[in-house]
């Protein structure tokens, strides 16, 4: 039964249903497919889904690919902080405490 439920989510997410896209990403995450999960979260985030933005930010930081050495990475991190990602706040604090960062 789980296979058919996930197939239904896949079809809904491909048709543009953002909640289904997030659910599909969570399914990928649960099954160890981080890259596919990030793709789901990022696409839903870019279309304005707030939970997807939080999940995407957490994945970027937890997987260590949310580099903040670039302006784009810093903006993603600040967006994750804005929507309440505790891992993002910790990462930003360590970034701010580096000696080469100037306010």
Q: Model-found features: residue ranges?
A:
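Short helix-capping/linker turns of helical repeat alpha-solenoids
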Residues: 16-17, 47-50, 62-64, 83-85, ...
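Hydrophobic face of amphipathic alpha-helices that form TPR/SEL1-like repeat modules
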Residues: 23, 27-28, 55-62, 94-98
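TPR-adjacent "capping" and linker segments in tetratricopeptide-repeat scaffold/adaptor proteins
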Residues: 2-19
């Amino acid at each position: 039964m789980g296979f058919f439920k996930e197939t239904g989510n896949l079809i809904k997410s491909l048709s543009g249903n953002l909640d289904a896209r997030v659910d599909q990403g969570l399914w990928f995450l649960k099954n160890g497919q981080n890259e596919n999960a990030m793709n789901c979260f990022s696409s839903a985030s870019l279309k304005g889904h707030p939970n997807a933005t939080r999940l995407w930010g957490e994945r970027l930081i937890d997987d260590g690919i949310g580099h903040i050495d670039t302006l784009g990475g810093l903006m993603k991190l600040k967006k994750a902080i804005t929507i309440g990602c505790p891992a993002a706040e910790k990462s930003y604090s360590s970034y701010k405490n580096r000696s080469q960062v100037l306010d």
